[in-house]
Amino acid sequence: MAMTVHVDIVSAEEQIFSGLAEFVALPGEAGELGILPGHMPLMTRIKPGAVRVKVQNQAEEEVVFVAGGLLEVQPGLVTVLADTAIRGKDLDEAKALEAKRKAEEALANQSSQLDYAKAQAELAEAIAQIAAIQRLKKGIH
């Protein structure tokens, strides 16, 4: 029997995933993080991107797009507190491409530093979402 860790992925709106996993991978602030059972305690910010969960006794990984947030790792428990979280199967490529286009337009027409920072964040989120969609389509997790 494989070792597991309990994983909770939650957003402000709802709980997206809760269950036992053999492995979790996600975009940390300093790069891609891989969490296995028994990982040392850790708390860090996460960047927009795909959280991949290798669920116990399941061939396919669960994929959840997060728009940033916090990761907390404790013995036996991994918690992802996401600003926004969308199940991989619910991602909409057309909406993501439209969000990217609008963010690029806002960057070109910014009227203040605040507008520029907001547009940069929206662009980074849209690009990460598109990358997650493309990886899902190709079967690359």
Curated annotation (Swiss-Prot):
It is found in: Cell inner membrane. Disulfide bonds: none annotated. InterPro entries: ATP_F1_dsu/esu_C_sf, ATP_synth_F1_dsu/esu, ATP_synth_F1_dsu/esu_N, ATP_synth_F1_esu_C, ATPsynth_dsu/esu_N. One of its GO terms (molecular function) is ATP binding. It comes from the Bacteria. Its main location: membrane. It is a peripheral membrane protein. Signal peptide: none annotated. GO terms for cellular component: plasma membrane; proton-transporting ATP synthase complex. Keywords: ATP synthesis, Cell inner membrane, Cell membrane, CF(1), Hydrogen ion transport, Ion transport, Membrane, Transport. Produces ATP from ADP in the presence of a proton gradient across the membrane. F-type ATPases have 2 components, CF(1) - the catalytic core - and CF(0) - the membrane proton channel. CF(1) has five subunits: alpha(3), beta(3), gamma(1), delta(1), epsilon(1). CF(0) has three main subunits: a, b and c. Belongs to the ATPase epsilon chain family. This is ATP synthase epsilon chain. It comes from Azoarcus sp. (strain BH72).
